[in-house]
Amino acid sequence: MSEIEGIVKSGVIIPLKPLTELEGKKIKIKIVDAESVDAEKLYSYLRLLREGEDARDFFKI
């Protein structure tokens, strides 16, 4: 079992790192903590994710 951080956008949890090892598996999610994030940083981060970049190193989210 591993701990994965993510962001919620429009009701969907977006992981902050690729989850290729979980592809096709059913998972159970437990929310331990919730923090607010800067909307401008979030938009830039999500744009890079859509372009296929690993954006975690660029932003402190």
Swiss-Prot record:
Belongs to the UPF0165 family. The keyword NADP does not apply. This is Putative antitoxin APE_0472b.1. Pfam families: AF2212-like (PF01954). Possibly the antitoxin component of a type II toxin-antitoxin (TA) system. InterPro entries: AF2212-like (IPR008203). The keyword DNA-binding does not apply. It comes from Aeropyrum pernix (strain ATCC 700893 / DSM 11879 / JCM 9820 / NBRC 100138 / K1). Keywords: Toxin-antitoxin system.
